[in-house]
Amino acid sequence: FGIETYFLSQHASNKQSAQTALRENEGITPLFPQQQNPVDFILNQMSHNASHRQSQELAIHFQNILKNKLNKRGRGVLQAPFVVLLEAEMPAVLVEVGFLSNRKECSEIAERSYQKQIAQALSTAILSYLPQFKKNLKKAKLRWPRE
């Protein structure tokens, strides 16, 4: 039981993370870009590396906020090859706020009041990360959308 936060990586943090990603990716076929010229490949790799670092930073941020706001055990920040995170062109994370296989958590998750707590904690995590995200955009000399 507890909260886990994942960010994309080709290699999973551990065996359990790898198994979770395999199970969650079942039936999904990722779209891979056609062969790129060397310059585009290098630019894509540079962009991916920056996004990967920022996703790790975002995952740590989410993990800390959620475990504190929801008063839950933190199970850590983990890496795994989740297809749902593959095409993100910005920092992206996958958060598990509980486990339906755990009776206590399952009944908590079913309660409307706890669902609201989860939504508020996620909202707090997102909004409190925005200044850092904007700072990262400036560092990369990119503009915030609609500014």
Say what each PLM segment does.
Residues 1-147:
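Active-site-proximal helix/loop segments of hydrolytic enzymes
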